Amino acid sequence: MSTNIAINGMGRIGRMVLRIALQNKNLNVVAINASYPPETIAHLINYDTTHGKYNLKVEPIENGLQVGDHKIKLVADRNPENLPWKELDIDIAIDATGKFNHGDKAIAHIKAGAKKVLLTGPSKGGHVQMVVKGVNDDQLDIEAFDIFSNASCTTNCIGPVAKVLNNQFGIVNGLMTTVHAITNDQKNIDNPHKDLRRARSCNESIIPTSTGAAKALKEVLPELEGKLHGMALRVPTKNVSLVDLVVDLEKEVTAEEVNQAFENAGLEGIIEVEHQPLVSVDFNTNPHSAIIDAKSTMVMSGNKVKVIAWYDNEWGYSNRVVDVAEQIGALLTSKETVSAS
């Protein structure tokens, strides 16, 4: 039995989630809420500058999209409470707008009839469970929560990495820097922004700014609260980012032992270890949350460790959104099966 999902928002993440979800046999994309006509949405799904041509053909139809024999209803309403989720029997509303990341706002999808909500960004408050695959997904609780957050792309990268290091060697403290590709939050040319550095042209400079990844990490790895802090450098590339993590460990280790810990972590599909001397473009459309750059692992004084982890901040993250949606759907199905028996 497949899970009925609706996607609110057709920006970068919304479109990538749609591409991935359409090829997941456990998910049924029923509806999309977006402000653009079907022709525009279909074109931007079929053709993508960063990730290339889609291997399925998405065609515009009246008030919707069609992929083979599958039809997707297209609606356009900026108030989620007005959306036809009850009528369409939506199990999970995936909100990819970034506008409803507070639980008090996201609950509008529940009021509209969706059983659960999944946010494609870190929660800004309210009764929301933050879930990161490979970190705390075993604690996903559909009884206690109706709204879930898939955190950020950076938290999805650093989370599994920090968990492995902490479990194997113990983290005393550390600092992280994410070297992050351009996002829609930046300006192509100088224009006002509440962050004056992000007000500057994203194509011309390396831009130091903040990241919420270390703060969000405490939501999924509470044992590391107060132990990690960090910042971001926005760089003029279109996609693929990395986390540069430096930590002091409780145990003395070698670089080989650190890399082996990631190899043996058992996080298939989440962490990958790369031994080739690659560059950012080589990780474009890589579905993993974190790709350890084994050649860059360093150890100093026995317990000070530097780890570089690459991540496709669009495609890798969107894969995790779909994974979490699939997990929520499976739990809903199991609950309904038990209730019916």
Curated annotation (Swiss-Prot):
Pfam families registered for this protein in UniProt: Gp_dh_C, Gp_dh_N
Top EC group: oxidoreductase
Key word Amino-acid biosynthesis present: no
Broad class of the protein's primary localization: cytoplasm
S-S bridge residues: none
EC number: 1.2.1.12
GO cellular component: a single term: cytoplasm
Protein name in the entry: Glyceraldehyde-3-phosphate dehydrogenase 2
Designated gene of the protein: gapA2
